[in-house]
Amino acid sequence: VGSEMCIRDRHGVICSDMPWCYYKNTKMRLFVCGAQKEYEFIRDTYGYPKNYVKYLGLTRFDGLHDFKVKENQILVMPSWREWIATPTSKSKNFDDVSDFKKTEYYQQWNNFLNSEKIKETLEKHDLQMIFYPHRNMQKYLKEFHPKSDRITIADWRKYDVQGLLKESAFLITDLSSIFMDFGYMRKPMLYFQFDMKKFREGQYQQGYFEYKRDGFGPVCEKLEEVEQELEKAAANQLQNDVEYLRREEAFFPLWDSDNCKRNYEAIKEI
């Protein structure tokens, strides 16, 4: 009587190391995982008592089996940067747009949106692209001006994230965990990771997931590589590569519409 029980059903699969999720910091009775390797990592390193961590699948995965893909739609979803979006007293304040425009983040993504080669690929293969940055970066949305009229800048107030993930045929992201949802649906993608070293030092540290070894698509560090990989994917009608499909299937051995049911039953048993 009077005791509280904490159960965690997260919004995404963890792939980096996140110390605030350690048992000593959460005291959670049930930590629900969405993937086998994630489960093994948290079980073995986060300090939870036996059977407190379970691989049940995230409840929202139940909604990722019934979808209709727009075959020519590419979704671009960059993640956020803590040192830009949530400045501390020790870091730069980027409320000034001119300061934001000096960041590598802005310059890289703006160059991406204004790439002549990407514009040509979209036109050549009759593709549409939706650029939807992380919610924390949306305050800078008006600063992005794509060269192609085939690229839509998406305001979070007008688009449903899960809807975009379900209907899009191909994903481009950097480090956003939404790639896990895309991979769960067995879809193709590529990563544009131009600032990985700074990201690891200033935001999330390396976890169990190594993008070049475990990722669900090619890892690009330069815009030229993105241009080449996107043209290659478009020429292949945005079909998934056999190797990346195999990785996706192996990463999510639980692949059904019983995620909510498993979570419900696990909670009842506590």
Say what each PLM segment does.
Residues R29-A35, I130, L171-I172:
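A short beta-strand/loop micro-motif in the catalytic core of glycosyltransferases
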